[in-house]
Amino acid sequence: MPTLFDPLKLGAIDLPNRIIMAPLTRSRATPDGRVPTDLQVDYYRQRASAGLIISEATSVTAMGVGYAATPGIWSDEQTESWKKVTRAVHQAGGRMVLQLWHVGRISHPLFLNGALPEAPSAVKPKGNVSLVRPPTEFVTPRALERDEIARVIAEFRLGAENAQKAGFDGVHIHGANGYLLDQFLQDSTNQRDDDYGGPIENRARLMLEVADTCIAVWGESRVGMHLAPRMDSHDMGDSDRLGTFSYVARELGKRGLGWMAAREAQIGPETQLVDSQGRPREAQHKESIGPVLKELFGGPFIANEGFTFESAQKALAEGKADAVAFGKLFIANPDLVERFARHAPLNAWDTGTFYSGGEKGYVDYPALQTDLAAAAIMP
């Protein structure tokens, strides 16, 4: 019966434990060039004891951004700066993969030099653009032309190639949370009538072609996919949740991907879900289909959403996951692995600094040794 502290072979990557650092947008890259900074070097180095670090979502193209100060991987300058991050993580004994990202319609012309966001179909998402003040509604995106889709695939390939140059251990494709690949997948956002729309075989085509191009660069054992079968981010929805995600899991399994991750836990009384601002939220589709997807995929399965140490151990023991990813717990606890191992108290996260820029709430959370030393000298 595996535990969080047992090793795991994740495709070609050997993990010393099953405690994964989930991808976390923190808005600490440079605002203009979207280049990783020295702060990010320190941040990821501090968390290198994770079995695997999955980087924050990183845009493969300037047309794929939708938030301030998030990093990219399309330019030489970005790639060179990511080298500093991977070098620091590896020197600290860690492993790290890059999450490849295109936000699709979840953007705004203010991030795109006045251009409309691109999407499978011209379907406007409900709600406001994240972190923009005053509150600003999303706009209706433009539908990608059929002959533009090859360009999108090429952008993901460039991101995968640059991730290799930057020294990552693999790539993690962002197919979740209502971003571009998820928008193509689900029938509420994909209303196309060509070979990228209609039946699931067509709607999943782009996601699978992106997987194939990343495999061509890295080999299947160093590529993973991130899915969100709860469909509760950014105004998403599909008429056949189980059928849609089952098809994708089966197809990814046929390709022998190194791992699959799903932002979906079994919701129970102990589950504490919060949104990206740290506010409590209700879950849609409380019944998990993760175990079904895990079986259909057939490879290592990472679960993520509202897990505690206890619920994560239970998920592993029951065979519902092979590893568990933690997000906000890693924000506040750079030494989360050690704290779990010692059953030590956890730092509380500060929601006000999630996206605020600067050191505060980013690289200044105390490590356990610091806490213990302070306690020892207290009168």
Predicted segments with their positions:
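Flavin-dependent oxidoreductase catalytic cores
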Residues: 1-379
